[in-house]
Regions:
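Conserved PLP-enzyme active-site core in the AAT-like
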Residues: 148, 152-313
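Active-site C-terminal subdomain of aminotransferase-like
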Residues: 279-384
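PLP-dependent enzyme catalytic core of the Aspartate aminotransferase-like
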Residues: 254, 429-457
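N-terminal entrance/gating region of PLP-dependent enzymes' catalytic architecture
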Residues: 2-140, 422, 435, 444, ...
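Short Gly/Ser/Thr- and Asp/Glu-enriched loop/turn motifs at secondary-structure junctions
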Residues: 139-140, 389-395, 429-434
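Conserved PLP-binding catalytic core of the aspartate aminotransferase-like
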Residues: 387-416
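A short linear hydrophobic-aromatic micro-motif
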Residues: 141, 384-388, 421-426
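Short, glycine-/Ser/Thr-/acidic-enriched flexible segments
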Residues: 183-185, 206-207, 234-236, 265, ...
């Protein structure tokens, strides 16, 4: 065995300096690049052929490993921050957020407790408090950054169930129920499955909006079994905003936890163009918003905010002898507020970006996407062979081409990516195939979108 092999990976040596320089050089080039291609996936067989085995007893070396990543693995990944990545909900992290993500890893930070990470917890909490204020929640509101909307929704709904259990005492129903729109995000059903509770989906009208009349009927039907009503502030498929104010008004007659799934759309509250559409959010018991979607942070981050953080803490604090020094303290430990213990301070890139550029820059960037969605919606209506499925509410634009089948949309989508013109995957609504632009990147232009529409002629 080679002398000092046990410490080779951790000492500062010429090898260490070289690999750090390699990684920083690549990161600098990628962050400052202005012509990064969309790229495209390839097959497992092809990746194995090109890369060969990389995990061996002796390793392939840092230079070879980075070369494999840069020239083989990375080109097999679609570039999610490309201005013409318009599928799902894209990610467009700011340059500051991307750069600071390196700092977070380099600093060996733990973001689970105040004891171990007071500085970063303070920074994250400043962002969470600012968001809570933007959403109209009280100064006492607070929460934690988790992995994504699925984790955020699950953590909030677990807290809601815990609060309902404490409220009812021994009078527990046979099955707990979550009330939500039939168009709610799939993560709500996923959370219910993990929690072993039922979902009561409420039908919407043609506009896809969850309204108080349907929620009232569900509350009457299920009574105390309801642990939460989930309203969506910007559905993934259309950007539809439920009637949150009307649903919140039901709290005058019914006692329920109101959770707002704003993973994509709630960020639009920062824009003066859309703020008025979110009336009622201030009455929520919990909300989520994903900074890696429309707040321009890197993957992955979801801000989970409780109206009363103590309810989140009671539901999620983990207890063990070795944790006594943390759990017996009244200091703010983020791991007490979600289904996690070990956590990276994933809110820091957003903090650095907000601190660097200021909130007004964020408002302008979000407004750009909303304006662009309205502009391209108008353009679509001018084209005789295209039709809007719904008027754009935020920055998602859904449209159909006359006489196209699902196969036509798929061929068109495949051709766009093959030609490196755009990444637009087909979608559907009520069994009808369609096309969909999800616009969050401030570098996406009207001309970009018109160019894509022209390929449908």
């Amino acid at each position: 065995m080679t002398d000092n092999l046990h410490s080779r990976m951790h000492v500062v040596s010429d090898e260490t300096r070289n690999l750090v320089n390699l990684v920083l050089d690549y990161s600098r080039r990628r962050t400052l690049a202005v012509d990064t291609p969309l790229d495209h996936p390839t097959t497992e067989t092809e990746l194995k052929r090109l890369a060969g085995p990389t995990i061996t007893e002796d390793g392939v070396g840092s230079s070879r490993a980075l070369a494999i990543f840069e020239h083989i693995f990375a080109p097999a990944c679609i570039t999610t921050d490309h201005p013409k990545y318009l599928s799902f909900i894209p990610s467009a992290p700011t340059k500051a957020a991307v750069a600071f993500d390196l700092v977070v890893s380099a600093s060996a930070l733990y973001g689970g407790s105040w004891l171990e990470g007071a500085g970063v917890v303070h920074a994250e909490n400043e962002v969470l408090s600012w968001l809570a204020g933007e959403f109209g929640l009280p100064e006492s509101a607070g929460g934690v950054f988790v992995q994504g909307g699925t984790s955020g929704n699950l953590s909030a709904l677990v807290a809601a169930r815990d609060a309902r259990k404490a409220q009812l005492g021994d009078e527990k129903p046979g099955r707990w129920v979550i009330v939500c729109s039939a168009e709610a995000h799939s993560s709500v059903a996923s959370a219910a499955a993990v929690m072993d509770v039922d979902v009561a989906p409420v039908a919407t009208g043609d506009d896809g909006i969850l309204r108080p009349e349907g929620v009232r009927a569900a509350l009457e039907e299920h009574g105390n079994a309801v642990i939460a009503v989930v309203a969506t502030s910007g559905t993934t498929n259309f950007g539809t905003i439920d009637d949150i104010a009307g649903i919140a008004a039901l709290k005058d007659d019914y006692d329920f936890w109101l959770h707002i799934d704003g993973a994509y759309g709630l960020a639009a509250m920062l824009s003066p163009l859309a703020r008025h559409k979110f009336a009622g959010v201030e009455s929520a018991d919990s909300v989520i918003v994903d900074p890696h979607k429309w707040l321009f942070a890197p993957f992955d981050a979801c801000a989970l905010i409780y109206r009363d953080p103590d309810l989140g803490r009671r539901a999620h604090t983990q207890r063990a002898e070795y944790l006594d020094t943390l759990t017996e303290s009244q200091e703010w430990s983020p791991s007490d507020y979600a289904i996690q213990l070990t956590r990276r301070p994933r809110g820091l890139p957003l903090w650095y970006s907000l601190a660097s550029y200021g909130a007004e820059t964020y408002r302008e960037a979000i407004s750009h996407s909303i304006e662009l969605a309205m502009q391209i919606g108008t353009e679509i209506k001018k084209r005789p062979n295209l039709r809007l499925v719904r008027e754009p509410e935020l920055s998602v634009v859904v449209f159909e081409r006359d006489d196209w089948t699902r196969e036509d949309y798929q061929r068109w989508s495949d051709r766009l990516l093959e030609d490196q013109r755009a990444f637009v995957v087909p979608s559907s609504h009520q069994g009808r195939p369609n096309a969909r632009f999800a616009i969050v990147n401030p570098l996406t232009t009207f001309e970009d979108l018109v160019d894509i529409l022209d390929t449908m002629e």
